[in-house]
Swiss-Prot record:
Coiled coil: none annotated. It catalyses: cytidine(56) in tRNA + S-adenosyl-L-methionine = 2'-O-methylcytidine(56) in tRNA + S-adenosyl-L-homocysteine + H(+). GO terms for molecular function: tRNA (cytidine(56)-2'-O)-methyltransferase activity. This is tRNA (cytidine(56)-2'-O)-methyltransferase. Specifically catalyzes the AdoMet-dependent 2'-O-ribose methylation of cytidine at position 56 in tRNAs. The keyword Oxidoreductase does not apply. One of its GO terms (cellular component) is cytoplasm. GO terms for biological process: tRNA nucleoside ribose methylation. Belongs to the aTrm56 family. PANTHER family: TRNA (CYTIDINE(56)-2'-O)-METHYLTRANSFERASE. It comes from Nitrosopumilus maritimus (strain SCM1). Homodimer.
Length: 177
């Protein structure tokens, strides 16, 4: 399954941290790429450093507008999943979404244009109360992958966490500069 995420907009200042966390969750929970509009370029640098240290090749692509990428992905056969607290319950939609091969998940920051609701193949709600888009994305990604994203290996990692019941164990790969 190919999973990509598009982040629509950003509320100035307050959202740099939230948008960074949307990208981090996307990466850690199995997405291959995130498309972002109106973003502080430092976020791309941060994610580049994460890839360099922790491995993987997660991509960030800056876009001028969400609409062309959503339409293009739809034409390529991607199913569009819009995260919205107004959508159908995730418990009711997750099985059908799991069957899809390619997904583009839309995560809004500001008021989402009505057109997104119409373009989406799935409008999915993680609870019907106000909540964080970060938590909604994490829950959706976990539900549709059934926890398998946690088995993913991140190639070329300089550091790797070794799960342990107590303490912490980080394997550090020696590098020569």
């Amino acid at each position: 399954m190919v999973i990509e995420v598009v982040r629509i907009g950003q509320r100035l200042v307050r959202d740099d941290r939230v948008t960074t966390h949307v990208a981090l969750v996307s990466r850690a929970f199995g997405a291959e790429r995130i498309f972002m509009t109106e973003i502080n370029p430092e976020i791309k640098d941060t994610l580049g450093k994460i890839n360099d240290t922790w491995g993987g090749n997660f991509e960030i692509e800056f876009i001028d507008s969400w609409k062309p990428i959503v339409k293009k992905k739809k034409e390529e056969g991607f199913k569009i999943v819009h995260l919205s607290m107004y959508g159908e319950k995730i418990n009711d939609a997750q099985e059908e979404i799991r069957k899809e091969e390619n997904l583009l998940i839309v995560v809004g920051a500001e008021k989402v244009p009505r057109e997104i609701y119409e373009l989406a193949d799935f409008n999915v709600g993680v609870g019907s109360q106000p909540h964080s888009e970060i938590s909604a994305l994490a829950i959706l990604l976990d539900r549709i992958q059934g926890g398998q994203q946690f088995e993913k290996e991140f190639p070329n990692a300089k550091r790797k966490i070794i799960p342990t019941k107590t303490g912490k164990n980080v394997q550090v790969k020696e590098t020569r500069d």
